A protein has these predicted regions:
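Serine endopeptidase catalytic core focused on the charge-relay Asp
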Residues: 73-88, 96-97, 104-224, 228, ...
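A residue-level detector for well-ordered beta-strand positions
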Residues: 92, 238-239
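Bacterial N-terminal signal peptides
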Residues: 8-17
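Residue-level recognition of alpha-helix boundary/capping or hinge positions
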Residues: 65, 107, 136, 294-301
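Functionally engaged cysteine thiol sites
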Residues: 28, 48-52, 56-60, 66-67, ...
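Bacterial N-terminal signal peptides that target proteins for export
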Residues: 1-9
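C-terminal subregion of chymotrypsin/trypsin-like serine protease catalytic domains
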Residues: 31, 217-222, 240-323
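Protease-domain processing segments flanking chymotrypsin-fold serine proteases, especially trypsin-like
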Residues: 20-97, 211, 310-323
Length: 323
């Protein structure tokens, strides 16, 4: 979630996020994390307030377990494998474009990182360092960065790569899946996923809007669609995935915090969706749709003459690629 959330998260996770621990796919680094510090104590305190984040009747952001992965859909398994921690937020592997392995996250996560961190994939048991930041753009709260991948892991990642669904508009009621490292009821930042009945698109409209976080709102606006997915601090940078096709259709960026009692009733949510209530623009979670990411980056390629040639060609390959 957005700038306000990242401020807290980057503090919470610094003790573990920047440790020199690494591994490759299938050969994870199993050294223990450090003992609890003041920052991890802060994480635990924040995590106890999960009710502030809940949308609908139940908190649906649940740990991803080996048992779940053994019976989950291929779309779910793929999404879990490509999701990583990245500093105080989340990132996800998109694919290899013009010879570069690209990850996506939020602008507000990347702006605080400066390519210092590792992308740590819990399910794959691998960690890859940031090599280059291609850019981060506040109006879509999106960032692209390149990771260094050893040759031995190329084949593994190639099978998992999936670009955004750039050409498909969102539809109200479209079922979603979000997987990230939010800390609500999760102070250890395990991988958690939400695919409950409320996690769906509530608006086929896209609006430029500010951050509705009442605790610590961010300073800029981003193009947004409303959704009912449970997300918390630490989920910043998570892909928003079509639950049926497995295609990334956007990226989370913020949400109303704390949630109102009305937004914590699934029956009320159903009524808001049915009637197109204006409350969906005040009370829920908000993501940036893939269609708007494509539109804005196309404009940047046309207008930003400061981009180096390699970045331009990589962005062009990213925007032109289709699944």
């Amino acid at each position: 979630m957005r700038h306000s959330i990242a401020r807290i998260l980057l503090l919470v996770s610094i003790p573990t996020a920047f440790l020199p621990r690494s591994g490759t796919a299938g050969n994870p680094d199993t050294r223990p994390l450090p003992q609890e510090s003041a920052w991890t104590s802060l994480a635990a305190a924040i995590a106890r307030s999960a009710e502030d984040y809940r949308i609908g009747d139940d908190w649906g952001k649940l740990p991803v377990t080996p048992e779940q992965l053994a019976t989950a859909t291929p779309e779910f398994v793929r999404a879990a494998k490509v999701t990583s921690t990245y500093g105080g937020g989340t990132a996800f592997y998109i694919g290899k474009f013009h010879g570069h392995h690209l990850m996506g996250t939020n602008h507000h996560v990347q702006a605080s990182m400066n390519c210092r961190g590792l992308a740590r994939f819990q399910v794959l048991g691998a960690a890859y360092p940031c090599r280059k930041v291609l850019g981060h753009w506040p109006e879509i709260d999106f960032a692209l960065f390149e990771i260094t991948v050893p040759a031995s892991d190329e084949a593994v990642l190639a099978k998992l790569a999936k670009n955004f669904s750039f050409d498909r508009p969102l539809t109200a009621g479209q079922l979603l899946l979000t997987i990230g490292h939010g800390i609500a009821s999760n102070p250890g930042r395990r991988l958690v996923a939400n695919q409950d009945s409320d996690c769906k698109v509530f608006s086929d409209e896209v609006r430029l809007m500010g951050d509705p976080d009442e605790y610590n709102p961010g300073e800029y606006q981003a193009w947004s669609f409303a959704n009912g997915c449970d997300v918390s601090h630490g989920d910043s940078g998570s892909a928003m995935i079509d639950r049926l096709t497995g295609e990334p259709v956007g990226i989370i960026w913020t949400g109303r915090i704390p949630k109102s009692s009305e937004a914590q009733s699934s029956a009320t949510l159903d009524d808001w969706l049915r009637t197109g209530s204006h409350e969906i623009w005040k009370q829920l979670s908000y993501g940036v749709p893939a269609t708007k990411i494509h539109e804005v980056l196309e404009g940047i390629l046309e207008s930003d003459t400061s981009l180096d040639r390699e970045t331009v060609e990589t962005l062009r390959a990213f925007l032109d690629s289709r699944n």
